[in-house]
């Protein structure tokens, strides 16, 4: 009887999920509308648990054309011990994306956070160089030809526009950027290589200006930086910035594009307390900047967001689209 009940329950869940897929696919897709307007993708994040969620997955399948692993490609997930690689979570997302015909963004190869202690404790330049090269080469090679773009280095700038202190900058200075990008280029010459950061929402902000200046120098010097990604969370008040209005998003993207990078993207978008106008401002900003190729929203439902109390996403805690969803479709 217990087994029979379980079978019935699973059948009902599967039926409900199937109906949900149909209803979502019947709606106009954010990705389809965005690409019809001339852009490459409108994406979201994914992990195995999110893709196994019968409310979340149909929205991913219907509305979003590119996927970024939220955590499972980061260093602590992929190489928690030196040479001890684990790709289970990342492989699940990659296989899903390939099966569904979606683009993939790799996130991220070097980041000061979610970094295993065995890396952060390295003090010898030659050792750290080798570790960076091995890690980057291993990850990029594993999914060569499957990942459209990699965030090679992530959040490496401080709020004053200088390099952030980390094991990478403390041991190698700014040369770690070249080392990482060259290793990634060698591992997959056709993959787009990005530098990604946050608080770049305002073109006049000190961090944005320092970032633009330094990245422009690196590109001019031959560091193979193809793209710039920005976490655009305009209304989220960081420790060193009071939050920026979405009206400045276009000027910020134009400033990033001026570095000489071949493309820019909003790689992480969640806006705490946003109005529909805020979302439309960001979408229009990308539409109006030729080099802006896409937008990745950092989550589907507020229920699953790391900032759930700020209601930062396009779907509410019941996985229902908010007014901003319709406003974006209308704007496109």
Curated annotation (Swiss-Prot):
**SUPFAM superfamilies for the chain:** (Trans)glycosidases (SSF51445)
Q: In which pathway does it act?
A: Glycan degradation; xylan degradation
Q: What positions does the domain GH10 occupy?
A: 45-331
What start and end residues bound the annotated signal peptide?
Answer: 1-19
Protein name (record): Probable endo-1,4-beta-xylanase F1
Give the active-site positions: 155, 268
| Listed InterPro entries | GH10, GH10_AS, GH10_dom, Glycoside_hydrolase_SF
Gene Ontology MF term list: endo-1,4-beta-xylanase activity
- Which function does this protein serve? Endo-1,4-beta-xylanase involved in the hydrolysis of xylan, a major structural heterogeneous polysaccharide found in plant biomass representing the second most abundant polysaccharide in the biosphere, after cellulose.
Main location group: secreted
Q: Does the keyword Transport apply?
A: no
Which domain of life, per UniProt?
Eukaryota
Recorded catalytic activity of this chain's protein: Endohydrolysis of (1->4)-beta-D-xylosidic linkages in xylans
